[in-house]
Amino acid sequence: MDVADAHVGQLRVRDEVGVRCQKLFLDFLEEFKEDGEIKYLKTVENLVNPDRSTLEVSFEDVENYNQTLATAIIEEYYRIFPYLCQSVSNFVRDRTSLKKSKECYVSFVDVPTRHKVRELSTSKIGTLIRISGQVVRTHPVHPELVLGTFVCLDCQTEIRDVEQQFKFTNPTICRNPVCANRRRFMLEVDKSLFIDFQKVRIQETQAELPRGCIPRSVEVILRAEMVETVQAGDRYDFTGTLIVIPDVGALQLPGAKAEIGSRHKQGDNAAEGVRGLKALGMRDLNYKMAFLACSVQVTSSRFGGTDMPMSEVTSQIMKDQMTPAEWNKVYEMSRDPRLYQNLINSLFPSIYGNDEVKRGILLMLFGGVAKTTQEKTTLRGDINVCIVGDPSTAKSQFLKQVSDFSPRAVYTSGKASSAAGLTAAVVRDEESFDFVIEAGALMLADNGICCIDEFDKMDPHDQVAIHEAMEQQTISIAKAGVRATLNARTSILAAANPIGGRYDRSKSLQQNIQLTAPIMSRFDLFFILVDECNEVVDYAIARKIVDLHSHIEHSLDQVYSREDVLRYIMFARQFKPVIQPEAMALLVENYGHLRQRDTGTTGKSTWRITVRQLESMIRLSEAMAKMECSEEVTERHVKEAYRLLNKSIIRVEQPDIHLDEEEGEENENVMDIGEETPEDTPRTNETEENDQDTPAVAKKKLTLSFEEYKNLSNMLVIHMRNEESRMESEELDREGISKTELINWYLSQVEDQLESVEELMERKVLIEKVIDRLIYHDQVIIPLKQAKLGETDQDDAGDQDVLLVVHPNYIVES
């Protein structure tokens, strides 16, 4: 609507629809009541302040008051917006001492329908709509001429309140009836009205983006109090209208200037007349769509992510936002005794095994508690996880599932990402040529998760760029005269391949991956996945993959739906557990163990243990407490955090030990070291009876977890070394302990746990298998086969009485 075109002399065209809406809206402001009082009377008093000029109105109130008025505002918003602002000005002036020269504006919130950026089309121009998107670029604030006062240079007539149509607009004609001037006007700056103006660019969010499509973006124009209220990387709801503005940037392309210059290079044609105006580089004025916003609100989806300020959210607020069925489900999940296991099964149903990795990622989703010290130093609460492993160990699958599951997650590849693409870039605006900041992946994932695949393929100078973001959670920029510190409160989930494609167990973690020590120390958890040839594991993985391809619905073992898990994580994140004194003492003790192991000559740590690992333990303990909706961090939470941290730092991820597979290797090794073959070994009645009893027990598969196997082997080794020390101190003429004595000692240690003869026989077979594995596979125990004078081969009946000693170079690992 160009109001200036309507002026002929002193006449103005009367818009009946606008005037009618102005009266109805003024009646709404004066009559709408809530709790017996006029709702907008109190907020009007704030508009007297010089820095306030906008009245915020809930669109739901307008719908409840007059449906016809609400429909007119929706359909003809841009047309009647000046009349609505005039209603606000009249309403304020009637009740306060507002200056006549001050303009007031209206902004609507709670508009029911939300549109995506991709859905914007010319049919929505001029209507009131609400769009949502992620801010990727913010421009500096500029003054905008809204109502200009001009002076006619022919008759000196003053022409007031000439509306500007998104570009500098002169009056169409002088308002003096006797003056026909249409071109010669001068702007009176001191009598014109300027307001603050800021342009931002929003982009489709990752969740709304169709697969394989480039994200769409749109320019959003902010005015008055709305300037400087948005930050790059955050998601907002913008309420306003779609407008068409001149594409000034297209007029400034270099082609026109070059063509004009070529026409005037030769001076001999200077006296010629002007011909061929189109060849002078004149361009048609193009237009583009933009969004004129009247209100800005942070996107606060019900349970879609962490967009709500977590410092303001309480359990009661979140309970009020749930339906009774949703709240009952959250309460039921919080009381689940197997919640830890059920959550990881529901979160990664299509990935077999790797439970420790799943637990680490689950705790990363809950996060720790961010804290601020008295010196205003921020201690991060986000947990960073790195997965290192051989090809085809589901590293990228973990990242893709997390990026699809988390509502505010950004997935990127390390090789295809630069330092500016990860942090922030300083680019030049195509219209004003000012330098502006464009958000990178870490800023776009603010309050979310940034998944970086092929992390080891990044260039070293690009890895250095995220040092600050990983620990201080800020990004500092000093480029092209722009100095800024931006938020990057994100958790980083990275995946990397070892050097050479395969993990070398003989080397430490730092020797296996191309990451610097500063980067490695900033990760809270490192998980190492090794692709080992194991018949049982390979069969289970193959069965899982075939099931997924054949009947996907039936192969997923999900206890809770993804919506239930997301709702529960959102609810649990608002807890801020406090560390109890007992847990505090255990944290210090565990940290001391890690440091001692690191400084010792026999240390097995993958890198230096620093205070950052202590902070990692604290964050993991807080995440465990959050998962259980607990207000306190107890010793149990600290033990699980220490176990996870210890597992990721100290040793490679190990599969279960299948003792049945060692029988063949044992027989081969017996022949290799010169023992008698089973056919040559004399058989006694006692051994025949044992052979008859053993198969019935041994038919059961013997499988131990790696931790159980190590605990059992350490128990045997420590006892054998104690016996060796005792024999040496007593000067006994004997070396080592027999296998029978070792088995009997172990059975005496666990006799309290045995309730039947069958359990005793099972435990006996188990310890025999463990000892055989320690002898023939791990070579931790050495059998002594030294024959003495007077002994024959028949005296060595079987290997039960073989003397066993511990390898002198073996070191017990805790």
Curated annotation (Swiss-Prot):
Gene3D superfamilies: 1.20.58.870, 2.20.28.10, mini-chromosome maintenance (MCM) complex, chain A, domain 1, Nucleic acid-binding proteins, P-loop containing nucleotide triphosphate hydrolases. A motif (Arginine finger) lies at residues 521-524. Its main location: nucleus. GO terms for molecular function: ATP binding; ATP hydrolysis activity; DNA helicase activity; single-stranded DNA binding; zinc ion binding. It is found in: Nucleus. SMART domains: MCM (SM00350). Residues 656-696 are annotated as: Disordered. This is DNA replication licensing factor Mcm6. ATP binds at S392, T393, A394, K395, S396, N497. Residues 339-545 form the MCM domain. The keyword ATP-binding applies. Acts as a component of the MCM2-7 complex (MCM complex) which is the replicative helicase essential for 'once per cell cycle' DNA replication initiation and elongation in eukaryotic cells. Core component of CDC45-MCM-GINS (CMG) helicase, the molecular machine that unwinds template DNA during replication, and around which the replisome is built. Keywords: ATP-binding, Cell cycle, Cell division, DNA replication, DNA-binding, Helicase, Hydrolase, Metal-binding, Mitosis, Nucleotide-binding, Nucleus, Zinc, Zinc-finger. It comes from the Eukaryota. ADP binds at R612, E615. GO terms for biological process: cell division; DNA replication; DNA replication initiation; double-strand break repair via break-induced replication; mitotic DNA replication. Belongs to the MCM family. InterPro entries: MCM, MCM6, Mcm6_C, MCM_CS, MCM_dom, MCM_lid, MCM_N, MCM_OB. One of its GO terms (cellular component) is nucleus. It comes from Anopheles gambiae (African malaria mosquito).
